[in-house]
Amino acid sequence: MSFFVNRIWYGNHFLQWILVPFSWLYRIVIRTRRWYLQRFCQQLYPIPIIVVGNVTVGGVGKTPLVIEIAKKIQQKGLKVGIVSRGYKAAIKHFPYEVKLNDSAELVGDEPLMMARKINCPVVIAPKRNEAVRYLLDKHSVEIIISDDGLQHYKMGRSIEIVVIDGMRKLGNGFCLPAGPLREPDSRLKQVDFVIVNQGAAEGTYSMELIPKNIVRLSTQEEVSNDLFTSEVAAVAGIGNPQRFYSTLSQLGIKFNPYSYPDHHQFKPHDLNDIDLPVIMTEKDAVKCYSFSSDKLYYLPVEAKLNDSFWEAFWSHQQLQGYY
């Protein structure tokens, strides 16, 4: 996201007021669209569909939460599957089940990362209903998680979980284009759970992204933070790189930031000219395996939520009888 857009959406730039009339028009359009799709086009399913999404543009930390929820479901002995749009995937035939040896360019960075971190089927399709039907037909899953897709109202859902960035929150509170909201903040009152990533607010649940040991990309060995006593290059192609940089600072690692657009497809030339050890996010690392070297590292993170969330989650009426 450009610095200029950030100033409008997350600051007090005068241009937001010029764009407000267009935001009201946008609200009318999306409200009408939602009503129509839910009433005439939504497909319901015989098993729980859990949607993990957001109401803002940009990264909020959904994917680590999807991974954690999938693991918790597996710990209950249940068969889980994940559906994703497969943003920027080069493949053209859908639905497609992600394979561990696929490239991020072929299937998308987030689906590939999820497939490698969880022993469950991950299926991509721009039309998510196609991915859901594939999982039901091919894998007989008992619960499906949709990574993003809150606004994909053709897909029925049993539970809606919205993630909010604790640093940027809802920005200036306006819908597109004056602000970062895909839907008005009143939408939060209609979902089942609101989770704040690295923060807290009344009526929400707090989530922390816990950094794990840094991993050398070429060998997959964990290394100590003590290895990085001098400056490194912090490379991030995610929606909110500041969160990644803040984590490195908390770990005591000195770095030069290198920010790229979200879902940037890294090429060797992006990193070869950097004359420093490179630490990147795990989401970015999956795009660099084909040209990994000893100077490339990544920092995995794990979503952690308190017991009160999990108690409320498993007590949800749509999950009764599933544990």
Swiss-Prot record:
Catalytic reaction equation(s): a lipid A disaccharide + ATP = a lipid IVA + ADP + H(+)
Record's keyword annotation contains Zinc-finger: no
Binding site for ATP: 56-63
Highest taxon above the source species: Bacteria
Pathway: Glycolipid biosynthesis; lipid IV(A) biosynthesis; lipid IV(A) from (3R)-3-hydroxytetradecanoyl-[acyl-carrier-protein] and UDP-N-acetyl-alpha-D-glucosamine: step 6/6
Keywords for this protein: ATP-binding, Kinase, Lipid A biosynthesis, Lipid biosynthesis, Lipid metabolism, Nucleotide-binding, Transferase
GO cellular component terms given for this protein: plasma membrane
GO MF terms held by the record: ATP binding; tetraacyldisaccharide 4'-kinase activity
UniProt EC number: 2.7.1.130
A biological process from GO: lipid A biosynthetic process
Enzyme class (EC, first level): transferase
Similarity annotation: Belongs to the LpxK family.
HAMAP family: LpxK
Chain's role: Transfers the gamma-phosphate of ATP to the 4'-position of a tetraacyldisaccharide 1-phosphate intermediate (termed DS-1-P) to form tetraacyldisaccharide 1,4'-bis-phosphate (lipid IVA).
Name of the protein this chain belongs to: Tetraacyldisaccharide 4'-kinase
Gene name, Swiss-Prot/TrEMBL: lpxK
